[in-house]
């Protein structure tokens, strides 16, 4: 309690605990060294150490041991507990967040010190990361497969050795009907702990695959370590003969999506704001909040507008109110704080014959289903009459101006400002968003 903590402070006692390995696997022995130090006047003579374990850890109890405090003022003890075979993994953290005991220490070192004022107790919890001997993960899943166009799909499986020393395992692949792999078992050898190996997989695709998710699984034979990877088959047309420049912010979604599309693309730098460089691109994407983090864009915004005027297409993604100036756009455009937080809020297409909804992919009502998080935020609240609103969307009971997707002709080119959360959906390979994004590239 409080009195105990106060007495420990007054006596200037400290308990230091060292663990030889904080990332452990079931079946491993670890070494815990605990040292009690009396930093003040020597008033601690005898220390009783004990090692406690959480009731879910189930280890053999270790009898408390007494240690005399040395002339230097310290006393130490070493424990070598065995990590039980059935101890649940805690990594990867993002998958284990809601497991029982996720953030609870598996062990606690307790030091009880006898003094003139009674017995004082110091406690030091030990939180370990528990890993399977070898972990397995699909890299960059879900995988995009274009129905009727792709006849093979390549993917990578990452194996990581957490076992101290060398390790050899067998990886077994399970493939759903419609996909096939020439090899389904792989032997993987590791020289030491922390080693990683990539196992490349090539799948053959049956003709006339249905557009849906196909779930693959990879398992380390003889263990509980496994992972699932989704191959997402999508009806998707991608425009030909395009080249895309991205004025990137802190996000990589658009670059990653263009790579998945196999579309030639480049991340633009300060050296690229010249007519010769910009005109090399059919479309330039201004990434989310780029005007906040790219001062070179702010300084060279006129070069971007001139690019549009000469016939280019600029697609500007969402920004927050304070980082946007209405003169960034070719005609005045002011951002508000309107947002649509309901992820399945109805979408009304205001210009159904517009190319954005028809070329090369025809967009239908179901393309808007299954969004993650909100529809969008910081929608434009006022804009010049030369913009055409393409989409209306609002939360129930609200009716903000339809500014979530505004398009205009400027000179010989096209300028699109859109505050919808496309990037979140593209990260997830949302099929409808993939189709609309491909249509944006064709504007």
Positions of PLM-derived features:
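Mature extracytoplasmic or organellar-lumen-exposed domains after removal of signal/transit peptides
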Residues: 1-19, 26-28, 40, 414
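Long beta-sheet-rich domains in secretory-pathway and surface-associated proteins
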Residues: 18-240
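Extracellular ligand-binding/catalytic regions of CAZymes and related secreted enzymes
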Residues: 130-151, 162-163, 169-171, 233-237, ...
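Aromatic-Pro/Gly-enriched surface loop or interdomain linker
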Residues: 223-287, 318-321, 341-342, 424
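Extracytoplasmic/secreted envelope proteins and their assembly/folding machinery
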Residues: 255, 278, 301-305, 434-437
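Alpha-helical scaffolding within the catalytic cores
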Residues: 269-274, 299-302, 399-405
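A glycine-rich, often tryptophan-bearing local segment used as a flexible ligand/cofactor-contacting loop or short
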Residues: 289-369, 418, 432
């Amino acid at each position: 309690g409080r009195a105990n903590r106060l007495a420990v402070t007054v006596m200037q006692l400290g308990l230091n605990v060292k663990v030889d390995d904080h990332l452990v696997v079931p079946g491993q022995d670890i070494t815990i060294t605990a040292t009690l130090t009396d930093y003040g006047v020597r008033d601690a003579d005898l220390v009783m150490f004990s090692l406690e374990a959480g009731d879910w850890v189930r280890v053999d109890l270790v009898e408390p041991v007494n240690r005399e405090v040395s002339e230097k003022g310290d006393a130490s003890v070493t424990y070598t507990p065995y990590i039980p075979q059935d101890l649940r993994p805690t990594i990867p953290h993002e998958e284990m967040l809601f497991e029982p005991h996720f953030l609870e220490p598996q062990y606690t070192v307790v030091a009880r010190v006898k003094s003139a004022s009674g017995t004082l107790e110091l406690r030091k919890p030990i939180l370990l990361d528990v890993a399977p001997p070898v972990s397995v993960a699909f890299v960059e899943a879900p995988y995009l497969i274009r129905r009727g166009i792709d006849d093979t799909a390549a993917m990578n499986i990452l194996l990581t050795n957490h076992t101290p020393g060398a390790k050899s395992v067998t990886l077994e692949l399970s493939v759903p009907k419609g996909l096939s792999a020439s090899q389904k078992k792989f032997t993987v050898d590791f020289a030491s702990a922390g080693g990683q190996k990539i196992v490349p997989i090539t799948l053959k695709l049956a003709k006339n695959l249905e557009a849906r998710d196909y779930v693959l699984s990879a398992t380390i034979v003889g263990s509980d370590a496994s992972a699932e990877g989704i191959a997402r088959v999508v009806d998707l047309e991608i425009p030909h003969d395009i080249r895309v420049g991205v004025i990137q912010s802190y996000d990589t979604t658009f670059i990653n999506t263009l790579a998945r599309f196999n579309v030639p693309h480049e991340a633009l730098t300060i050296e690229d704001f010249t007519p010769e460089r910009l005109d090399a691109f059919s479309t330039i994407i201004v990434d989310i909040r780029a005007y906040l983090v790219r001062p070179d864009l702010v300084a060279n915004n006129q070069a971007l507008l001139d690019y549009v005027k000469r016939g280019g297409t600029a697609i500007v993604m969402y920004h927050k109110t304070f980082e946007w100036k209405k003169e960034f756009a070719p005609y005045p455009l002011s951002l508000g704080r309107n947002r649509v937080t309901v992820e399945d809020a109805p979408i009304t297409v205001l210009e159904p014959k517009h190319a954005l909804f028809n070329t090369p992919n025809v967009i239908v009502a179901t393309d808007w289903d299954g969004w993650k998080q909100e529809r969008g935020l910081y929608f434009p609240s006022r804009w010049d009459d030369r913009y055409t609103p393409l989409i209306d969307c609002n939360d129930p009971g609200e009716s903000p101006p339809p500014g979530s997707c505004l398009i205009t002709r400027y000179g010989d080119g096209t300028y699109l400002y859109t505050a919808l959360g496309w990037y979140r959906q593209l990260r997830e390979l949302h099929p409808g968003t993939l189709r609309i994004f491909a249509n944006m590239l064709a504007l």
